[in-house]
Curated annotation (Swiss-Prot):
Residue ranges annotated as motif YXXL motif: 650-653
Residues in compartment: Cytoplasmic: 627-665
Organism for this UniProt entry: Radiation murine leukemia virus (strain Kaplan)
Name of the molecule in the record: Envelope glycoprotein
Gene: env
GO cellular component, one term: host cell plasma membrane
Glycosylated residues (UniProt): N43, N199, N211, N324, N356, N363, N396, N400, N432
Amino acid sequence: MESTTLSKPFKNQVNPWGPLIVLLILGRVNPVALGNSPHQVFNLSWEVTNEDRETVWAITGNHPLWTWWPDLTPDLCMLALHGPSYWGLEYQAPFSPPPGPPCCSRSSGSTPGCSRDCEEPLTSYTPRCNTAWNRLKLSKVTHAHNEGFYVCPGPHRPRWARSCGGPESFYCASWGCETTGRASWKPSSSWDYITVSNNLTSGQATPVCKNNTWCNSLTIRFTSLGKQATSWVTGHWWGLRLYVSGHDPGLIFGIRLKITDSGPRVPIGPNPVLSDQRPPSQPRSPPHSNSTPTETPLTLPEPPPAGVENRLLNLVKGAYQALNLTSPDRTQECWLCLVSGPPYYEGVAVLGTYSNHTSAPANCSVASQHKLTLSEVTGRGLCVGAVPKTHQALCNTTQNTSGGSYYLAAPAGTIWACNTGLTPCLSTTVLNLTTDYCVLVELWPRVTYHSPSYVYHQFEGRAKYKREPVSLTLALLLGGLTMGGIAAGVGTGTTALVATQQLQAAVHDDLKEVEKSITNLEKSLTSLSEVVLQNRRGLDLLFLKEGGLCAALKEECCFYADHTGVVRDSMAKLRERLNQRQKLFESGQGWFERLFNGSPWFTTLISTIMGPLIVLLLILLLGPCILNRLVQFVKDRISVVQALVLTQQYHQLKSIDPEEMESRE
């Protein structure tokens, strides 16, 4: 700050606006609802920048968002790169060695190529960073009791601090703007995001400076309010000024967070949402071999990139394989149906043993699965975190995470269903900092099981049920299979994993494609993305129905299955079965019924001409009678009118009595 306009008293005052500032900041800070699972690991880089927004210092690590707040230790001279000329580093490149020769000790000639005595007094306006001697003097200034440095916040400061100025005064235009630093009055604040202090003591910094290296390391720590802020991606700015006699040299520095997803996201095609609309690929026939078959473990070949039809067919095939291995009697003849409306998946809570990892497993860095929420979870299983009372019915065992930072990976065939979404692994740091909770579940696609008679009756239109038959889903038939829960006839371990291997692969592929669809929809239709996704699944099933690959039963798309597997041309199979039932039905009909069934055109002709014939017959029968009545009515009316007309043209003569005439005479 300028000594010509401002005095420099020792600071021991408390800002009376402090409590109000805390309330304002708490009212403004709220966690950002990011489009990622809070347990997903990202590559995070905290960067310290100079006035030109060039990165001059950085630290990198792999952590979940908003859980890693390391101490930042840049050098004071690094912040002055390309800064004001009195720092002497206007032409110094970032991350380059410090300039200038070393300073000389009292014994002349002890340091070859030295310049200036290390003990020479500091003069005003001397560059502070361009030589080892100046850096040593700068270190003594920052550690001196009556000198030091102070830091003022930039644009993120409250409104009452408008008098603090802008970058031209390093945000320190008046006293009271400083919030941290190393000075005799110990500047502090209850609302700023960082604190700044010396990283080295004066005794530690002196030999480092004499060795011609950066020796004015700072320690920048995040405050509690700074750890609550989620605007670090755009960055925040501060001004730093030295507290010396005369003019206070200053500089501008910033702090920002760079977030890099560890997994690649490369779109292919003009529209990633619809680019996978392709016909089903024909299955490859296995090569002919004359060798004697031997028992080998089940291995699945690497499938080609699946389109919509293939993904949905793979779900049905995986469901059939799991059902056939566990309940062969149910697959003698059946229909497996995909539901066109949500929910598309069901969760079954299970008990399992997860694995602990001190470093993030590979699946923790996979693209976020948070966008899929399980609307139906049944059973009782393992819960982690602060489970609310409304969801404690799902918990057989609730485990609290202890202190420390580690990761909980779900066992094979399961996934963590959290209040923030689906994730393959958890970060205990996130669970300890939040009130999140998770349940270990098996994920089953919404595939319903129907008997053949029910399907045939629906298409024939002769079925009359007092109530809708209960639909059996995979979650009811196979729930708990992976962890050896209620599956009858199948043991745990390898057999259970083999039974669900193809189904799990199909579920994984379908979830991945659904996530991609939601991600693309969110970019343009934030509020309507869920509705569009539901219509998308309905259109996918409509494509299958129109292509004859499945039979549409109400809101479901059904595939015929028997011991030969899932039939791809389900409509052809349905027509074949319906024709057989039609022939059986016709064999029991009389000649009159067969007449109509054998000649469809005759039924159409009769129904077409029957109406006009009946109308014509009624006209012929009732027409003459009605016409006579009408003519007679008209004649009667006309005669009455004629009589009225005649009476108006003539007057009635008065009758004369002869006797009266005689009496008058």
